[in-house]
A protein has these predicted regions:
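Extracellular/luminal ectodomains and secreted, surface-exposed scaffolds of diverse proteins
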Residues: 115-117, 131-142
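Residue-level recognition of well-ordered beta-strand positions that form the cores
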Residues: 150, 165-169, 184
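Extracellular/luminal low-complexity segments enriched in Ser/Thr/Pro
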Residues: 1, 140-160
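Solvent-exposed, low-complexity, repeat-rich "mucin-like" stalks and linkers
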Residues: 6-129, 183-188
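Beta-sandwich strand segments
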Residues: 173-180
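Hydrophobic residues embedded in beta-strands of well-ordered beta-sheets
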Residues: 108, 127, 136, 145-147
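A short beta-strand micro-motif common to beta-rich folds, especially ectodomain repeats
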Residues: 1-2, 9, 158-172
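Short structured motifs
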Residues: 121, 131, 148-150
Length: 188
């Protein structure tokens, strides 16, 4: 208030930063492997079962430090579905990030088969298409840092754990750097 004798107030904040802002270490981008786990209900009639907020879960901080980019820069550099699904796509252009799925053989698939950025995934963790023996999926919203996992109702098995590997691939000066997020989906 203007009649307060301490006005104008002076405040100082320390030990804090903007939400999602990360202290980036010096050096070149590196690869990263990180993991998440979630318990899910195999009897659920809903397709989406859980959404990870990668920013709040600390995953984006790890990726930001590995790629040497702020989370907001990663979101802005993440390619749209139409670019990635284009015929002949083999990886992101310089300065760009593509979301893929690391298959059990180590190859990265960019053949999106779920809504937007995402994949229907076979029981062994390889990229597939809906209805062709696939039971689980993930979808990614780059702007919201939201990674949603789910299943085809009636297809997932109680007592089974499915492992999937959503992967962000960053191209820096022609070299591809991968952030592999291994997710264990435990169905009860």
């Amino acid at each position: 208030e203007t009649n307060d004798e301490q006005w104008p107030y002076r405040v100082k904040f320390s030990g804090t930063d903007l939400l999602g802002n990360v202290t980036i270490p010096e050096g070149d981008p590196t690869d990263l492997e990180t993991s998440l786990e979630v318990s899910l209900d195999a009897s659920s009639e809903s397709y989406p079962l859980h959404t990870f907020n990668l920013l709040n879960d600390g995953v984006m901080e790890k990726i930001a430090k590995a790629f040497k980019l702020q989370p907001l820069e990663i979101a802005g550099a993440t390619l749209e579905t139409g670019v990635v699904k284009a015929e002949g796509f083999t990886g992101p252009a310089d300065g760009k990030v593509a979301v893929g799925l690391t298959n059990p053989d180590g190859s990265v698939s960019y053949a999106y088969s779920a809504n937007g950025i995402g994949f229907w995934i076979a029981e062994d963790g390889s990229a597939g298409v809906w209805g062709d023996g696939t039971k689980i999926y993930f979808e990614y919203d780059a702007g919201g840092y939201a990674l949603t996992v789910g299943h085809k109702p009636g297809a997932s098995e109680k007592g089974k754990t499915y492992t999937i590997k959503p992967t962000m691939v960053y191209n820096k000066n022609g070299k591809l750097h991968k952030a592999v997020i291994t997710i264990k989906m435990k169905f009860a």
